[in-house]
Each structure stands twice: as structure tokens, then as C-alpha cells.
Amino acid sequence: MKKLVLTLAAVILSAGLMSAQDMAKATETAQSANDALVAKDYAKALAGFKEALTLAEACGDEGAELVGTCKSVIPNIVLSMAKNDIKEAKYDEGVAQLEEAIKIAEQYGAADVIDDAKTLIPQVKKSKATALFTAKDYAAAADAFKAIIAEDPADGASALRLAMALTNTGDKEGAIAAFEQAAANGQEANAVKQLANIYLKDAQALLKENKLKEAIAACEKSNEYVESANAYKLAASAATKLKDNAKAIGFYEKYLGVSPDAKDAGAIAFTLGALYQQASNKAKAIEFYTKASADAQYGAQAKQQLEALKK
């Protein structure tokens, strides 16, 4: 019995010595990892603290404090690695590291790292999309902004950038939808200008193709977003070619209403005078010929018409 007790004592002493040696190894490994962290060698630091954690966990209660330290440091190292990737414009790698940081932080209870990483992820995705747009890689930028909006449909600023990217890829319908989404989410002022411009360009192209009714419809659509003198003038031109004088008169009058001091205001007033004269509306013809009478180019003709109308 005495021999058995002595044997057990030897085993316990040996285990104690081994535990002390393991703890010393864990501490030494953690110290080396910390030195690497100070030197910003994050990969070496991460590997070191992971090894120290495993060693400390094997030491039971003696290693509890070091276990806590390692679990506190490891998520922050991964977060630092992510931030380093982001600084180097390695956006995909940065996002992957941030997601890894969240995973580890959830396992180790590092709430501050979780909050920081979750805040950074959408910012990094936007940085990537913006960088692609700046580099004029519009197709890739569009894909990046689509992914952002899929996660946050209320992100009007990203919807606006998506619309601009799609415009540059020639996806007009996609751009229109994105501009509409941007307008509905805080970017109305910028989005409606772009929408108005899209339809105005359509109107110009349709007018050149002699698709007159379609050109008028595009002008009217443009004016639904932002009223413009150019849209009214194009619509008036199309209506004149269609010999729809009533519509032409309406569009020209709106043109002058929006841009009364336009360089061609005199010419438009003279045109209106002539259109009203053709419509046998003497009073309105006189009104607009009078407005045109001071015009350098059309003034003389306007005065002649006024004299004829007043007879």
C-alpha cells in the first residue's frame, strides 16, 4: 500500500512538472506572438496566439487567464488584417477577413469586434464598387452596386451610382429602374434630372428618325421629371412636322414660359404669330407679332404682319 501511495505521488509530481512546463511554453508562445503583433506581422501574431490558446487550454485552471487574453486578442488581429487589406484596396479579401473576424468574435464573445466589422463590411463593398466605377469598369461596378442594393434596397446613393453605371453600359431600361429607385430613396433631385435627360435624348433621336409622335411622347415624359425649354421646343418641332398646329402652339408657348429670355425668343414669338394667324386667331397673332417686333432678325417681318392685321 505504501508503495502504491509513493507511486501515485510520483505521478502527481510528474504531472505538475509537465503542467508547469506546458504553461511556460504557452506563455512564451504568447509573448512571441505579442512581439509579432507589435511589429504588425499579423499573420505570425495570429498563428502564435492560436497556438498559445491551444497550449493554455490544455493547462486547465492555470491557463485560464492566458486563454482569456488569447480569445480577446485573436478577433482583433483578424480585424486588423482585414483593415490592412482594405487599405491596400484588396476589397474582396478585406470583406472575407471581416466575415472571419465576426465568426471568431461571436465564438469568443468579442462584441466590439462584431460591431466594428459589421459596420465596415457595407463600407468596403461601396469602396470596391466606387473604385470600379472610377476605373470605368462600368459592368463590374454595376454588379457591385446591385449586390449592395440587394442587401439594402433603401440605399438611394448606391442606386444612383448603379443607374449611372448602367447608363454607361447602354442598359437604358436598367438605368431608368435604378434612377427610379434612387429617387424613391432620398436622391430625387439628382435622379429626376438624369431621367429627364434620358427621355430628352430619346426625343432627339426619334425626331432625327422622323418618328414624330414618339418624339413628342418622349418630350412629355422628360417634362414629367424636369420641365425644360429644350423638351418643349423639340415637341413643338415634331408637332409642326405633323402639321398639328394646335399642339405646336401649346408647346411653343410653354417654351417661352420656361425660357422667356431665350436667344431665339423673338423667332419663336414670330412663329407663334404665324401659327395663330393661320388659325384665324387675330388677337393672339397680334400679341405674338408684337413680341417679335423688336427682334433683330424677325422684327421687320413682324411689323409688316402687324400692319396687315390692323387694316
Predicted segments with their positions:
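TPR alpha-solenoid repeat register
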Residues: 62, 110-111, 117, 158, ...
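Terminal, low-structured helical/coil segments at or just beyond the last alpha-helical repeat
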Residues: 201-213, 217, 263-266, 270-311
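Short coil turns that delineate tetratricopeptide repeat
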Residues: 57, 106, 153, 186-187, ...
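Residue-level recognition of tetratricopeptide repeat
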Residues: 34, 76, 83, 130, ...
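Canonical tetratricopeptide repeat
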Residues: 65-69, 73, 80, 113, ...
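N-terminal leader/linker segments that initiate helical-solenoid repeat arrays
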Residues: 2, 6, 13, 17-83, ...
